[in-house]
Amino acid sequence: NKANQATYERLQLLAKAVLTAGYSVIVDVTFLKKLQRARLRCLAAELSAPLVILDFQVAEAELRRRIQQRATEGIDISEANMTVLDYQLAEQQPLSEEERALALTVWPDTMPAEVTERLSERGYDRNQSRFDS
């Protein structure tokens, strides 16, 4: 839909501004569609910026449990509900082989320090908030 497309276009513009300023950027959005991911990959290539995809792997039952728990506790800060989850599960397109080569898979039991370590293995310097060239 148009609102969804506008969101991705805006995120791409913001990412470009941050990258052009010489910093790393995290674009935190679902990227369900290959086209959405391809546009960001093109931006990274255009700016000679490294790209890492954080591929969060959570079982569907666990996703449903989390949504239900947040709804029960009344602490949900997102628009996530079962309808949104059903849509996302139906619409998601798996990572291509090329995208998987760029991906770090993150499981529910993956500790943040492990993600940081794996990013540093790819050249990310958290003290500089950027990848080493």
Can you annotate each of these PLM segments?
Residues 23, 47-52, 97-103:
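Short glycine-/polar-rich loops that comprise or flank the Walker A/P-loop
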Residues 72-118, 124-133:
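Small-molecule kinase domains that catalyze NTP-dependent phosphoryl transfer to phosphate-bearing small molecules
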Residues 18, 43-47, 95, 122:
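Hydrophobic helix-cap positions at the C-terminus of alpha-helices
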Residues 1-12, 37-38, 57-60, 64, ...:
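Amphipathic alpha-helical transducer elements in NTP-driven molecular machines
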Residues 32, 59, 111:
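Glycine-/small-residue-rich active-site loops that bind phosphorylated ligands and cofactors
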Residues 46-67, 106:
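Conserved phosphate-donor/acceptor-positioning beta-strand/loop module used by diverse small-molecule
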Residues 44, 70-73:
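Short, hinge-like loop/turn segments at secondary-structure boundaries
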Residues 1-43:
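Conserved nucleotide-sensing/catalytic segment adjacent to the nucleotide-binding pocket
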